[in-house]
Regions:
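N-terminal cofactor/phosphate-binding cores enriched in small/glycine residues
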Residues: 13, 20-79, 93
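Short Cys/His-rich metal-coordination motifs, predominantly Zn2+-binding knuckles/fingers
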Residues: 59, 158, 202, 243, ...
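Cofactor-/ligand-binding subdomain signature composed of acidic, glycine-rich
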Residues: 252-287
Length: 287
């Protein structure tokens, strides 16, 4: 995972971000420096509890002396580095990336911040055509169990789910990228149905998905019936009681019923990752 060094660092580096001097510990990334400077740098494939994979290119910034834009989520800071996060070149790149993504998949259930970024950068995905024309996108949702749904019409191939299923959390490797080019997609081994795969239903893939391609079955059903209302939900933090690890749970409650369970990514015990019991073992608590 990409972690900023803690404790007393051996070396502090000083760089300039949008004209402001920022001091960060050696080993920090440009994104760390941007956030320390209070800048809202968009990210899609990055998460604080996952290893950067550099695929979305939304977080790119301009570094003085570099011919190409660089991904801030993984580029380590160097002493004296001069970074521009809001230049015309950066804004154009981010606008185009967001347009291409939003024109290729359905984004109506994506995280709210994605819509905010699109408005901020003036993205107009409609000028790219209808996303339903893409063969790999126009596919029905995979409802294969009672826990969660895979709706790949909304998948942007950020690979967060693959990372969470693999080295960064669960080490199950039940899913991976299959195919190439326009045929690339997330798949189980040999494209078997999820209950027949190596999946252990920890749900960590759901916890990191930014576009709603992976959702709780409860949320999916409530959206179909028009009863899902995120604004009306109350979130209560508690501690999972199934074992002695002490994982923190955020219970999302609507109409006095638990509709889904998440975990804070910045919690020191599990970094937001849970097992099947913590993520889905709450049906007994329903009124």
């Amino acid at each position: 995972m990409n972690e900023t060094p803690v404790g007393v660092p051996t070396t502090l580096l000083e760089i300039t971000v949008d004209g402001e001097t920022v001091t960060v510990p050696e080993g920090a990334t440009i994104l760390d420096a941007c956030r320390r400077a209070g800048l809202d740098t968009p990210t899609l494939c990055w998460a604080e509890n996952l290893t950067p994979v550099n695929v979305c290119r939304v977080c790119v910034v301009e570094v003085e002396g570099s011919r190409v834009l660089v991904p801030s989520c993984s580029r380590p800071v160097e002493e004296g580095m001069v970074v521009a996060t809001d230049s015309e070149r950066v804004r154009t790149s981010r606008r185009m990336v967001l347009e291409l993504l939003a024109s290729s998949v359905a984004m109506d259930r994506a995280d709210e911040e994605i819509a905010d970024w699109m408005n901020h950068y003036g993205s107009r995905p409609e000028r790219m055509g209808d996303h339903h024309e893409v063969a790999t996108v126009a596919q029905p949702a995979k409802v294969q169990d009672g826990l969660y749904v895979r709706d790949y019409e909304r998948c942007i191939l950020c690979y967060k789910c693959v990372e969470a299923c693999g080295d960064d959390a669960q080490h199950t490797f039940a899913i991976a990228t299959a195919g190439r080019g326009f045929g690339a997609h997330i798949s189980t081994e040999f494209d078997v149905e999820l209950p027949e795969s190596a999946c252990v239903y920890c749900g960590n893939c759901i916890g990191v998905c930014p576009t709603g391609a992976l959702v709780f079955k409860t949320e999916y059903d409530m959206r179909l019936t028009g009863t899902w209302d995120a604004d009306a939900q109350e979130v209560t933090r508690t501690v999972c009681g199934f074992c002695g690890v002490g994982c923190n749970l955020d219970l999302h409650v609507q109409d006095e019923r638990i509709v889904k369970v998440t975990s804070p990514a910045d919690h020191s015990v599990t970094d937001g990752h849970l097992c099947i019991k913590g993520r889905f073992g709450w049906r007994h608590a329903q009124p």
